[in-house]
């Protein structure tokens, strides 16, 4: 049976300055998925990022964390998609989401970029917004002037625990989401409640 999701991309910024920051939630998810499958992401120049191919839960998935900066993510995503002839609708892009509380996640198909530079560049390079998104909640600082410092700030202990819990839940629903049962996966994931 054809897979609905063939490629999972984690948006983030490269380098130790950005490790474990809220803005790197997507990249942290893809690292966790690779670990779950017993694989390690390795540098791959032709895809401008860290790459692994995994066989997991009956799925054959290409994992990519672009090593470009966030606002150039589309370069890496397009390079990998073009090489393996993966269509945009078969791509799941995991990214941090200010408009969701920490420890929650939502699956979404299509839509705008909502001011997220990684999504903006992905849409520009793919020439469409018709790809799937995994929105990982990081919360909002409450003041739009504080957003940059907030997203580039490091995750606290409780936030890390909440992200780990939601990553586990995403991994439970991903096989359904990738194999034609997106509605069921969304229902389960969207009803997941973070630990207080």
Swiss-Prot record:
Function per UniProt: Hydrolyzes ribosome-free peptidyl-tRNAs (with 1 or more amino acids incorporated), which drop off the ribosome during protein synthesis, or as a result of ribosome stalling.
Organism the protein comes from: Marinobacter nauticus (strain ATCC 700491 / DSM 11845 / VT8) (Marinobacter aquaeolei)
Keyword set includes Heme: no
InterPro entries listed in its UniProt record: Pept_tRNA_hydro, Pept_tRNA_hydro_CS, Pept_tRNA_hydro_sf
Site annotation Discriminates between blocked and unblocked aminoacyl-tRNA: residues: 13
Its EC number(s): 3.1.1.29
Subunit text: Monomer.
Family the UniProt entry places it in: Belongs to the PTH family.
Primary localisation category: cytoplasm
Record-given protein name: Peptidyl-tRNA hydrolase
GO biological process: protein quality control for misfolded or incompletely synthesized proteins; rescue of stalled ribosome
Active site: 23
Top-level taxon of origin: Bacteria
Compartment(s): Cytoplasm
Catalysed reaction equations from the record: an N-acyl-L-alpha-aminoacyl-tRNA + H2O = an N-acyl-L-amino acid + a tRNA + H(+)
């Amino acid at each position: 049976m054809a897979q609905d999701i063939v490629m999972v991309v984690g948006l983030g910024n490269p380098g130790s300055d950005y490790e474990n920051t809220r803005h790197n939630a997507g990249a942290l998810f893809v690292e966790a998925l690779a670990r779950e499958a017993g694989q390690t992401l390795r540098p791959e120049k032709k895809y401008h990022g860290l790459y692994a191919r995994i066989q997991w839960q009956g799925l054959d998935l290409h994992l990519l964390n672009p090593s470009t900066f966030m606002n150039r993510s589309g370069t890496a995503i397009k390079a990998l998609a073009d090489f393996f002839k993966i269509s945009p609708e078969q791509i799941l892009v995991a990214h941090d989401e200010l408009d969701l509380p920490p420890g929650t996640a939502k699956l979404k198909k299509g839509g705008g970029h909502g001011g997220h530079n990684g999504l903006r560049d992905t849409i520009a390079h793919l020439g469409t917004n018709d790809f799937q998104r995994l929105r990982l909640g990081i919360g909002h600082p409450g003041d739009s002037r504080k957003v940059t410092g907030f997203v580039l700030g490091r995750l606290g202990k409780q936030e890390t625990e909440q992200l780990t819990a939601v990553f586990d839940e995403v991994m439970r629903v991903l096989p359904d989401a990738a194999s034609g049962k997106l509605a069921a996966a969304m229902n389960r994931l969207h009803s997941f409640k973070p630990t207080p």
